[in-house]
Amino acid sequence: MKYTEFLHTIETEITARLDNDFKLTIHPVKKNNGMIYDGLVIINPKFNIAPTIYLNPYYHWYLDGVSIDSILDAILSTYNDFKPTEDFDISFCDDFSKVKEKIIFQLISYDKNQKQLKDVPYIKYLDFAIIFEVYVGAELPEFGTITVTDALLSRWGIDTETLIRASIQNTPRILPCSIINMAEFLAKKCPGYANQMRAVCDFDSLPMYILTNSRQTNGASAILYPGVLSSLAKKLGGNMLLIPSSIHEFLVMPLDSDIDVCNLSEFICEVNSTEVRDEEVLGERYYIYDSKTDTVY
């Protein structure tokens, strides 16, 4: 079954399983790094919001031999996990005073998001772009944000500096830093990634950590939290290697570790192509944190 036929089958079969007053749409959704996914939206007429379920991964399930019935069950299960239970009033976004304490920043690839960056306020940082969002995760059953666009900034009547100040105060408070032992995490969650990492260094015996946030979502921005890198450098004994594992986290280790730095960039590219979703790739090279100057390069 080709992809277009798969989408039609999903739409037809899901519609047949819903009550008559429900509506279903499939539409393209722009994601990070210029990726476009097909989003399934199941609309309950009682509420003004609905979760978006991306169908592209389910097609890979189908190609791997998973039955259509099992895929339909999984899609409906996902919908039930995130279906709305009340209306969501988005009008508060029109008033900056109501969202000022919800402004956060996120780190994304600069090169891979050139088209998106034309319409949003951002700051260039190394090979990344710092963009700004309104965090609405507290009001929704999933990690929810609304990207701050140039149009929204104009509506608020503020400048980028105001966004920066608000986000620096809010992001560490809303999404506190989380530092996780990498060996323990990868052995449990990502054995494939762990095996690839062993080809570069003996990470089982080295002090290496995952730097993310409390939600482990869009957590790579935690490297920007005031004092986080300097504090971690004291723990690790000096300068550090920073590896952009994905938009969700950085891997951090001592610079003087027994690690093959020459092959590290090649390793990052390989992991990006095999273990990280296209829309979650952050960077393709490593960085160094200088503990004496408190800078990253």
Cite the ranges covered by each PLM segment:
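Conserved, function-critical positions that sit in or immediately flank catalytic
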Residues: 87-123, 127, 137-141
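A contiguous, surface-oriented mixed alpha/beta subdomain in the mid-to-C-terminal portion of proteins
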Residues: 119-275
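Short acidic-glycine loop/turn motifs at beta-strand connectors
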Residues: 46, 254-257, 289-293
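A generic structural motif
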Residues: 26-29, 242-245, 278-285
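Helix-rich interaction surfaces within compact, conserved domain-sized segments
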Residues: 267-289, 294-296
